[in-house]
Amino acid sequence: MPLTENQIEVAAESLFQAEISRKRIGLLSVQFPEIDMEDAYKIQAALVEKKINSGLKLEGWKIGLTSKAMQDALKIDIPDSGILFDNMFFKSGDEIPTERFIQTRIEAEIAFCMKGSLAGEVTREEVIQATDYA
């Protein structure tokens, strides 16, 4: 059974406040054992709205859980996607303010800066054509 709109709002607000206060919260999958991918993306959408309303700017998207090992660990069978905001980027040489994070970690990411849009099923060639640089 899908989460209710109230449960989605509670989950999104919990995540939003955890980021602001830099305090851990429990796993949403424990709080809401019936949660599924569709619910997770609804929570993400509600969280994105909160962040945009707080003044953050959407800068891009990311694909996560691309390795089979991580998918197996989380009991999912497809990669997920996430939103990148302007406060998530640091330039070479920047000092990263560790106090901003609950648990400071650095993860290298490969970024594709796009010059065109992609939608639906696309070919490798279409991705290359839409990519400005990586």
Regions found by a protein language model. Name each.
Residues 2-134:
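Active-site microenvironments in enzyme catalytic cores
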